[in-house]
């Protein structure tokens, strides 16, 4: 029998009034740094001010103070999110056609922005149907509002005001928990309590309350809406909540209340907690009863998970014990020491969270179209394309951020003296093998995937279609993907016998679902064209990983620069007199990784956009004949590079290029402007610092001549600053160009 020492009781976990509130520091730019606070000598000062303002590590080495600043900043972030949400709901209430859309979502487009006529820009107010003129929105808010049971613009107003109140509350909390009652370091490090509260509270009770809202408010209101009842005739949410008879008319088992729950006769509830699979044929979205059931189930899981970790009661798991027990046959000490890393070095913790959240965001992108969760979302092609693109970009940025903070952790926080033979140490010791193998994989994937396209272009150019890789000549069918599709399509009858349809129509087997003459979703065929582009995906993803992982594993030292850790996270080169050591800092790997991330995500969203227009989206005639937007040309056109240029980029750019004089003209201007921003980046990326310094000095000479020289000396951007400005404009220009291209196209044809 093991006698454990009693767990320590909870101590006082906050400091009262640690830092007095004062606005004086607001008037002192750079108050957090002795150097910057002195004020500007040269124009470099303003760059340093921005670079270090939120780099709390550089303000102090006191971990408790850093933790408090981060914690407080999180409340500020939440405040901004609530403010943004409030603005979205306010636009829905004040400037939108939400009530009209609700009454006829198949013929009326969603709009929540009306442009004021000042210099003729009211041309942007296009006709979205129902006699309303405004800018068509593609955020999916209307669909979410309908799914949650919002039936009037008054309800949107109330929610907007509520969000503003919450924004103010968050601002107050940020001030309060830094200036009035600041948590002690021990509170931030109490991971078991944190897990219990976040799992049971945020995820468990959050899901449970959403499930409750769905059952008591969303489901009945959506039942009425689907039956064509006028939104103004539908009872208000509180009437459903307070009056059980109203619900019992729609779902008879409601009359029995909680009795079936306590008598374990749960199947009584299967009217509104279903397990159907597939899509609701009326709205083209997942069955809302399936969604309510899902949230209830998730809530139970997380409520249980939120009681798993050991706090004051001496029962449950301890994270440190779990990690230290985690040893495999080939992993030495395993995760020993990881607990200390993750509870004291926040960059490591952040890196992990960014990697998980980034991956999750990309998973969301893929589920939003394959299992469209909201009513009338699947037939709103512009919104579908926007949601996919948005979540892919966000996921890409978060994953690069994960590598960035992993590298910062390696440079600033990793202590090699007390890490021996644990997992991280073992990875670092065979990093050469990892990176060289990964490099080989990248070369293999690059040559072979691109080589297949080049072969096809060559055969096509020589007029030999019979020798091309295509569905009609030499087939390269994606047999594994087709097998997975088939397995899922057959699941309802076999591995998931309770389901009536498979999780997603895209797997195959089922019929297509059309709403209002438009295809919502249908089985997606995969062929040679998909096989080719999937290998490009594999190539770009592996190269991104190669660059980012090399940056992390060689952040502290390399054969070229053994003392790299002393040079810091970002540095241009290893000092004067040592050639060939530029672009080796951990920061430079993030910089280079961003370009490949952009590359990878671009191919993904191009693939998605074209594939959906070619093989999924389109109209259906009364005879049941489907006409796709681009007539199924993906399979034959996307198998050559020339096809991508001619039939995707050029052919589909016609809408944005010809948008002048129409309500889509703003996209035409953005398309042009964003190209300019992108080109502007090349000026920073292709020229060196000396060129600009030389130019600046001659400009300063002219100012001196006229006696108008400023006191602050102008300086050229440092090498790192120039690269940062370059990559920012490159990504901003590239993403905005793609945005204008996609939206002008899909709003015009979708």
UniProtKB/Swiss-Prot annotation:
Subcellular location per UniProt equals: Plastid, Chloroplast thylakoid membrane
Kindly list the GO molecular function terms attached to this UniProt entry. 4 iron, 4 sulfur cluster binding; chlorophyll binding; electron transfer activity; magnesium ion binding; oxidoreductase activity
Span-the-membrane segments of this chain are: 70-93, 156-179, 195-219, 291-309, 346-369, 385-411, 433-455, 531-549, 589-610, 664-686, 724-744
Q: What residues does [4Fe-4S] cluster bind to?
A: 573, 582
**Gene Ontology biological process terms from the UniProt entry:** photosynthesis
The cofactor note reads:
P700 is a chlorophyll a/chlorophyll a' dimer, A0 is one or more chlorophyll a, A1 is one or both phylloquinones and FX is a shared 4Fe-4S iron-sulfur center.
Q: Quaternary form?
A: The PsaA/B heterodimer binds the P700 chlorophyll special pair and subsequent electron acceptors. PSI consists of a core antenna complex that captures photons, and an electron transfer chain that converts photonic excitation into a charge separation. The eukaryotic PSI reaction center is composed of at least 11 subunits.
The free-text function statement in the UniProt record for this protein reads: PsaA and PsaB bind P700, the primary electron donor of photosystem I (PSI), as well as the electron acceptors A0, A1 and FX. PSI is a plastocyanin-ferredoxin oxidoreductase, converting photonic excitation into a charge separation, which transfers an electron from the donor P700 chlorophyll pair to the spectroscopically characterized acceptors A0, A1, FX, FA and FB in turn. Oxidized P700 is reduced on the lumenal side of the thylakoid membrane by plastocyanin.
The entry sums up its family as follows:
Belongs to the PsaA/PsaB family.
Q: What is this protein called?
A: Photosystem I P700 chlorophyll a apoprotein A1
Q: Which gene encodes it?
A: psaA
């Amino acid at each position: 029998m093991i006698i454990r020492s009693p767990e320590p009781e909870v101590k006082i976990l906050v400091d009262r009034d640690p830092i007095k509130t004062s606005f004086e520091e607001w008037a002192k730019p750079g108050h957090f740094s002795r150097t910057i606070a002195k004020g500007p000598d040269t124009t470099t000062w303003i760059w340093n001010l921005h670079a270090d303002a939120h780099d709390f590590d550089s303000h102090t080495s006191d971990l408790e103070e850093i933790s408090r600043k981060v914690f407080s900043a999180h409340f500020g972030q939440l405040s901004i999110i609530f403010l943004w949400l409030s603005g979205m709901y306010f636009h829905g209430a004040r400037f939108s056609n939400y009530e009209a859309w609700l009454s006829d979502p198949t013929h009326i487009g969603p709009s929540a922005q009306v442009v004021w006529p000042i210099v003729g820009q009211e041309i942007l107010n296009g006709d979205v149907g129902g006699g309303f003129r405004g800018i068509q929105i593609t955020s999916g808010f209307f669909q979410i509002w309908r799914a949650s049971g919002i039936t009037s613009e008054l309800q949107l107003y109330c929610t907007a005001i509520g969000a503003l109140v919450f924004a103010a509350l968050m601002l107050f909390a940020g001030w309060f928990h830094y200036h009035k009652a600041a948590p002690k370091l021990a509170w931030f490090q109490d991971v078991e309590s944190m897990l219990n509260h976040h799992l049971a509270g945020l995820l468990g009770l959050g899901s449970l309350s959403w499930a409750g809202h769905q059952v008591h408010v969303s489901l009945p209101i959506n039942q009425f809406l689907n039956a064509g009842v006028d939104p103004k005739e539908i009872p208000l949410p509180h009437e459903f909540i307070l009056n059980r008879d109203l619900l019992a008319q729609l779902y008879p088992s409601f009359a029995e209340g909680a009795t079936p729950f306590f008598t374990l006769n749960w199947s009584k509830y299967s009217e509104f907690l279903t397990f159907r699979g597939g899509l609701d044929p009326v709205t083209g979205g997942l069955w809302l009863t399936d969604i309510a059931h899902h949230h209830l189930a998730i809530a139970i899981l997380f409520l249980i998970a939120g009681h798993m970790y050991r706090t004051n009661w001496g029962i449950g798991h301890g994270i440190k014990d779990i990690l230290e027990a985690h040893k495999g046959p080939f992993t030495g000490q395993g995760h020993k020491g990881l607990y200390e890393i993750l509870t004291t070095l926040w960059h490591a913790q952040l890196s992990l969270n960014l990697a998980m959240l980034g991956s999750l965001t990309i998973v969301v992108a893929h589920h939003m179209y394959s299992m469209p969760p909201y009513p009338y979302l699947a037939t709103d092609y512009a919104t579908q394309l926007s949601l996919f693109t948005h979540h892919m970009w966000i996921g890409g940025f978060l994953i690069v951020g994960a590598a960035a903070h992993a590298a910062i952790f390696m440079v600033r926080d990793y202590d090699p003296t007390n890490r021996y033979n644990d997992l991280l140490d073992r990875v670092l010791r065979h990093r050469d093998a990892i990176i060289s193998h990964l490099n080989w994989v990248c070369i293999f994937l690059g040559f072979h995937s691109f080589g297949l396209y080049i072969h096809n272009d060559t055969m096509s150019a020589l007029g030999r279609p019979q020798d091309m890789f295509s569905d009609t000549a030499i087939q390269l069918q994606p047999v594994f993907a087709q097998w997975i599709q088939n397995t899922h399509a057959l699941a309802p009858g076999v591995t998931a016998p309770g389901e009536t349809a498979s999780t997603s129509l895209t797997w195959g087997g089922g019929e297509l679902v059309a709403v209002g003459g438009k295809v919502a979703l249908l089985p997606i065929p995969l062929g040679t064209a998909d096989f080719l582009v999937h290998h490009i995906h594999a190539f770009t993803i592996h190269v991104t990983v190669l660059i980012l992982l090399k940056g992390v594993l060689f952040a502290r030292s390399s054969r070229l620069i053994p003392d790299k850790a002393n040079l810091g996270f970002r540095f241009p080169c290893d000092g004067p007199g040592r050639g060939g050591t530029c672009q080796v800092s951990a920061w430079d790997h993030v910089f280079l990784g961003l370009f490949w991330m952009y590359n990878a995500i671009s191919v993904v969203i191009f693939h998605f956009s074209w594939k959906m227009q070619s093989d999924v989206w389109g109209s259906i005639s009364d005879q049941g004949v489907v006409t796709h937007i681009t007539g199924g040309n993906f399979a034959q056109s996307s198998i050559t590079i020339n096809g991508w240029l001619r039939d995707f980029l050029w052919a589909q750019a016609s809408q944005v290029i010809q948008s002048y004089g129409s309500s889509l003209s703003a996209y035409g201007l953005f398309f042009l402007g964003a190209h300019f921003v992108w080109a502007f980046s090349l000026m920073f990326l292709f020229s060196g610092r000396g060129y600009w310094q030389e130019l600046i000095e001659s400009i300063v000479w002219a100012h001196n001549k006229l006696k108008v020289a400023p006191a602050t000396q102008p300086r050229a951007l440092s090498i790192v600053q120039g690269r940062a400005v370059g990559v920012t404009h490159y990504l901003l220009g590239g993403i905005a160009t793609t945005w204008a291209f996609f939206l002008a196209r899909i709003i015009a044809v979708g």
